[in-house]
Structures are given as C-alpha cells and as structure tokens.
Curated annotation (Swiss-Prot):
GO molecular function, one term: electron transporter, transferring electrons within cytochrome b6/f complex of photosystem II activity
UniProt record, GO biological process: cytochrome complex assembly; photosynthesis
InterPro entries: Cytochr_b6-f_cplx_su8_sf, Cytochrome_b6-f_cplx_su8
Intracellular or extracellular location(s): Plastid, Chloroplast thylakoid membrane
Taxonomy, superkingdom: Eukaryota
TM segment ranges: 3-23
Purpose: Component of the cytochrome b6-f complex, which mediates electron transfer between photosystem II (PSII) and photosystem I (PSI), cyclic electron flow around PSI, and state transitions.
Name of the featured protein: Cytochrome b6-f complex subunit 8
Mode of membrane association: Single-pass membrane protein
Length: 29
C-alpha cells in the first residue's frame, strides 16, 4: 500500500466519522 492510497483511506474514514458525528449531535445524542 503506497502513501496515496493510505491517505485516501484515512480521508474517507475521517470524513465518514465526522459526518456521523454531526448527524448524531443533531439527533440530540
């Protein structure tokens, strides 16, 4: 696995995590 694909995986995981966190916060936890 090269650094480019590793960065993409990290970016996708971070994006999905932040998105789910925003939705979770809007639902009032």
């Amino acid at each position: 696995m090269d650094i480019i694909s590793l960065g993409w995986v990290f970016l996708m995981v971070f994006f999905s995590f932040s998105l789910s966190l925003v939705v979770w916060a809007r639902n009032g936890l």
